């Protein structure tokens, strides 16, 4: 069935949820890019130092990302089933879990920051700055975990405009305090990389407050006043539901980060300039991912609702609409990256050697973005239906094996250096696209109960 055969109401409903979700994800990625741009004023070493913290940070967040996928899928399904009280029981259990887990994880990562960053391949020029940045970011991770968790529940309920506003304000706070604290403006101290970390934490503090406020309304599908009024308590059955959907996502996240860490180590081994160019490339690729991520969140909400309402064909239709929209966006982005790659890198670095490396990276990213957005949507559709074991297997094959092996082959065997590492990313994205699309089209995911 072609896109134009869908009725206007299905397309309108998809776009009404998709545009805030895409805008939210885009501005989060854009804030990361601006963060790198402002940090680049300190030198290539600072960009590389921040880049070294990315993978260990996400390993620390793996448990919470898995829980977020669970709560989003479960809330969407319960909304489709019309079971508001059960959804809030799951939400109450989820909140207690992430708060306790975030405190424990934060203490652990701050304590072990030095050996963790050394394990990530830091050099003398980047180690101390990376450790400082990592400690501050992970010290404030509880605020990040709270806002991510509540926003995931809101997305599952289809409230993407609420999460968009939360993240827009958070990212604005981050950028403003980056300006004030990195180099020191309007009487604020020039704190360098420490200022960048503090600005990020301040942004998450604001967003966590806004997120909590968003569920403090009785008419929301997930609502703290409702939980208190009806004396809904966390329970083991709800926790078991969260684990059932999320355990394979957690395994997937860990295996993903093993693959990402391996390629990050290879990039770090290419030297500070190559690592700096690589980090900016990752941030730029994050911009394209943001569109897929927004459409993925849309697919989770609509597919979960449709399956909960016992309408699997409508669920598949929504997934196809999201993928078509994503495909159109990816073609536009690929063209922009091909034409504007040198200009983008010129904003970050004065050193022509780094800009030249970046132009090569951007040519590869132009290919990656076409594969990436579609695979993210397909995989999001499967996760939203609860087919998380399959997505974990696909991620293991694609990222942990294909990406790592491909990066090693092109980087060292073919001697392509940092560009070879990005060819490994192409192999990863292509593998996930093929395996995700085949599973989606077969339709087995429509029969999964969660």
Where are these regions (language model features)?
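Transmembrane helical elements of multi-pass membrane transporters/channels
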Residues: 16-35, 136, 170, 203-207, ...
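Transmembrane alpha-helix boundary and packing residues in multipass membrane permease domains
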Residues: 21, 25, 36-37, 73, ...
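Helix-terminus/linker motif at the lipid-water interface of multi-pass membrane proteins
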Residues: 30-48, 117-124, 180-191, 254-287, ...
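Transmembrane alpha-helix boundary/anchor motif
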Residues: 34, 70, 107, 111-115, ...
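Small-residue-rich hydrophobic transmembrane alpha-helices
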Residues: 47-107, 144-163, 275-341, 372-396
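Short runs within selected transmembrane alpha-helices of multi-pass transporters and secretion channels
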Residues: 68, 72, 137-156, 163-171, ...
């Amino acid at each position: 069935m072609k896109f134009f055969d869908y009725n206007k109401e299905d397309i309108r409903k998809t776009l009404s949820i998709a545009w805030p979700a895409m805008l939210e994800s885009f501005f989060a990625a854009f804030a990361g890019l601006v963060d790198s741009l402002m940090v680049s004023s300190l030198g290539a070493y600072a960009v590389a130092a921040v880049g070294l913290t990315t993978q260990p940070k996400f390993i620390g967040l793996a448990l919470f990302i898995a829980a977020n996928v669970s709560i989003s899928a479960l809330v969407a399904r319960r909304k489709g089933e019309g079971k508001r009280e059960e959804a809030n029981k799951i939400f109450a259990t989820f909140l207690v879990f992430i708060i306790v887990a975030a405190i424990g994880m934060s203490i652990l990562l701050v304590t072990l920051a030095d050996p963790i960053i050394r394990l990530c391949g830091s050099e003398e020029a980047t180690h101390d700055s990376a450790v400082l940045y990592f400690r501050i970011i992970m010290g404030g991770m509880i605020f990040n975990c709270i806002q991510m968790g509540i926003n995931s529940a809101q997305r599952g309920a289809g409230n993407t405009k609420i999460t968009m506003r939360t993240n827009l304000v958070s990212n604005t706070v981050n950028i403003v305090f980056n300006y004030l604290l990195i180099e020191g403006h309007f009487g604020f101290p020039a704190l360098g990389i420490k200022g960048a970390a503090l600005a990020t934490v301040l942004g998450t503090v604001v967003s966590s407050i806004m997120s909590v406020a968003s569920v403090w309304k009785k008419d929301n599908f997930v609502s703290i006043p409702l939980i208190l009024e009806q004396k809904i308590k966390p329970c083991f059955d709800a926790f078991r539901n969260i684990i059932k959907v999320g355990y394979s996502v957690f395994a997937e996240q860990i295996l993903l980060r093993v693959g990402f860490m391996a390629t990050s180590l290879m990039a770090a081994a290419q030297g500070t300039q190559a690592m700096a160019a690589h980090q900016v490339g990752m941030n730029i690729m994050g911009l394209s991912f943001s569109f897929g991520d927004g459409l993925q969140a849309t697919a989770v909400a609509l597919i979960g609702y449709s399956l909960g309402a016992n309408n699997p064909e409508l669920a598949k239709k929504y997934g196809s609409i999201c993928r078509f929209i994503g495909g159109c966006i990816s073609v536009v982005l690929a063209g922009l990256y091909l034409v504007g790659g040198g200009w983008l890198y010129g904003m970050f670095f004065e050193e022509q050697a780094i800009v030249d490396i970046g132009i090569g990276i951007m040519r590869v990213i132009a290919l990656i973005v076409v594969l990436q957005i579609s695979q993210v949507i397909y995989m999001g559709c499967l996760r939203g239906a609860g087919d998380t074991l399959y997505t974990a297997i696909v991620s293991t094959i694609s990222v942990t094996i294909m990406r790592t092996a491909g990066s090693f082959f092109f980087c060292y065997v073919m001697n392509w250096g940092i560009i070879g590492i990005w060819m490994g990313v192409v192999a990863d994205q292509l593998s996930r696209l093929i395996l995700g699309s085949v599973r989606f089209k077969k339709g087995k995911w429509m029969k999964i109960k969660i």
